[in-house]
Amino acid sequence: MHRSASRLTRVLACAAVPVILTVAGCSSDSGKKSGTDSGKKSDASSSSQPSSKPSKEALEKAVYAALPEPCKAVGAKTIETIVPKAKDANGTAAKSNDLASRATCTWNGLDEAGLKGSQYRWLSISLVRYDSLASVGTGSKRAEDEYAKQVEKAKAVEGAENVKPEEAGGIGDQATSVTFTTKKDGDFFNTSVIARTHNVVITLDYNGTAYEGATAPDQAKLLQDAIAATKETVASVAAANEAKQPEQSAQPEQQPSPSNS
């Protein structure tokens, strides 16, 4: 009887082992499956969330969409003052395929004073406007790059002497003046003023010389006149775009198509 009870105990103990192992195995598999499912759900959840970073940065719209007529960038009174006896007071416009982006006008005049000699003046106003383009940047940034190039160009004129660049405050967003002298058929006193107003670059070149014993031009006065003309041109750029805005707003708004419902 004792042996039978002992044997029965051993049989029950052995029979219980597979049950425990089976339960443990199920628990282990269940945990792995749960973890896998959780990982999949996490991956799916993260992939479904929209990216907070835009694929392309929104470009800042160019401030100016137009240029003034180059030969009207400065007034008739200004031309009469700084280019006396101008050959054509209306100026000569350079050819351009796109006057809304690039325009130039020039004036020249010889003021003859008999025995006192003659004074010659030449003026050029060039305007370049840049749009914002995804491939190259904003209009203002493109204008900044062009402004820097024009300043360096003015400082590196072939044959220039006594080159003196200076920052010119109070003109647009950036401005630099460059004065220098050159020798052609006389001593020419040159002034270049390069200015940037938002996405437009203005390059104003102004020079003068004296003939037949006339007093040489005053370089300081040439610079003063050039700066004043550049400020006037900056104002003309702004005015040209203010005039354009009412035209755009006057266009009738497109009405939504009627609903089919």
Predicted regions and their residues:
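Bacterial lipoprotein signal-peptidase II cleavage site
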Residues: 23-50
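Secretory targeting and sorting signals
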Residues: 1-29
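Hydrophobic beta-strand segments of well-ordered beta-sheets in folded domains
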Residues: 1, 50-52
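A small/polar (G/S/T-enriched), proline-flanked helix-loop surface module common
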Residues: 31-35, 43, 54-261
